[in-house]
Amino acid sequence: MRSQPTRREILAASVVSAPFVGCSGTSQREESGPDTGDLDAAAAKPVLDVSALDTPLIIDSIRLLEKDGDQFVHVRSKDGAEGVSLTNGRRYLGPILQDLVIPFFVGKDARKLESELLFELYRHRSNYKLQGLALWSVQAWVEFALLDMMGRACGKSIGDLLGGTIRDEIDFYVASGRRDSTPEEEVEYLQALVDETGAKAVKFRLGGRMSRNLDASPGRSESLIPLARKALGDAIDLHGDANSSYDPEHALPIGRLLEEVGAVYFEEPCPFDHLEDTKAVADSLALPVSGGEQEYSERRFRWMIANRGVDIVQPDLHYYGGMLRSARVANMAELAQMPTTVHISGGFGFVYMLHFASRTKDIGRYQEYKRNIERYADWFDPPLWIRDGKLGVPTGPGVGIRDIAAVIGGARELI
C-alpha cells in the first residue's frame, strides 16, 4: 500500500467547502491554478534594471570566437564597452547567428534588450519560424554577452541587473548522465561524484531516453533506485530523470519507487511534449514531477503552470532563449507557488545558472552542476568556489569574468 497521498488527495484535503465535482471525480479547484490573465501579467513584469545606465549603449559589433574548445560571443559598444558569453557549443547554429541575429542587434541600444529588442528579434525576417533550440540558443548567447556588457558598464552583477541578488551561494546536485552502466556500476560512479564534489544530492538517469517504455537495459531502473538509496545513504538526496522514456502506465511504477526512497523529484517522466500525460503522472504521485528542459513556448509553460501539469518548471537557459525569457517563466511559477529549477547546458552553463539562481525567489532545493569548475575558476576574482555541497555566486560586474582580453586573447574568429 502506498504510504504517501497523491497530489490530488493533498489538494482535496485542503478544500474547506467542496465545489462542483464533475464526472472525472476531481474538483475544478483541484484542476486549476492561477488565471491565465494573471499569469500573463506576472510574466510581463519588467526584470532588467537599466536605471544606472543613463546614456545609450549602442551595439557596434558582435563576433563568434573559438579558443581551447570554448566558443565565445563577444560584443562591443560604440563607446568601447564590451561583454562576452560562452555558448553551449552548437557551432552549426553559426549561420543563424551571422545572418539573422547579429544584423538585427548591431546599431541598437542594448538598454532596450527587454523592453523592445527581444520581441523585435523574434519578428525580424520571420525568425519566429525558427523558434526552438535553433533560434533561442543563439538569442541566449547574445543576451548573456549584452548582460555582461551592461553589468560591466554600471558595475552590477547579472543577478543585480535582473532585480537584485537574494543569495550568494547555491546548493547543487551532481548528475551522472550515464545509461551504459549496471546499477552497481552506477552507484559506484555516483559515490565517486559525491566524493569529488562534496555534493549533498545526485541525479541519475532512468529508462532509455525517448525509448517508448524500454529501459536502457532490462530491469536497470527498478534495481537502480533502491540500490542508490542503500549505497549512498539517507544523507544524499536523490533525483531521477527519465528523459521522456515512459507513458503514464509505465512511469507510475518508477515514480512509486522514487517515492519510496524519498527522492526530491521525478524529471520528465513522459515525452516532453505530451503535457497531458505528464500531468496524469504528476496528479497520481505525491513526489514532485518536473519538466520543461525541451520547452520553447511561453504559452505551453503557462499551460503547465495554470493546469499544474508539473510541480517544478525547468526552462533551459540556453534552449529557452536566455535569462529574461526564463525569468518570465519564473514570475508565472512564483504566482502559482511553484519552484523554478533551471536546466543548464554547456560546460560554462553552471555560471549562468548561478546568476539566475541568485535572483530567483523560489529556485528549488538544488541546482544542477556538471562539474568542470576548475576550468573556469581563475577567470574570476575572487575565483569561483565549491565547498560543502554549495557553489559561490560570482561577485564581479556582469558575469564576473575579471579580464575579457586575457580570456579571449588569441581566439580564432568564426564570425
Residue ranges and their predicted role:
Residues E143-R179:
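Glycine-rich, aromatic-flanked loop segments that form ligand/cofactor-binding clefts
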Residues S14, A377-I415:
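C-terminal extensions of enzymes
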Residues D168-L285:
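Metal-dependent enolase-superfamily TIM-barrel catalytic cores that perform enediolate-based chemistry
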Residues I62, K78, E82-C154:
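Metal- or metallocofactor-binding catalytic centers and their adjacent structured scaffolds
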Residues G80, V142, G155, V202, ...:
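Conserved, mostly hydrophobic/aromatic
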Residues C23-K67, E82:
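C-terminal segment of N-terminal export signals and the immediately downstream linker at the start
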Residues P95, P103, L130, R256, ...:
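Shared catalytic-loop signature of beta/alpha-barrel
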Residues M1-A18:
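N-terminal secretory signal peptides and thylakoid transit peptides that target proteins
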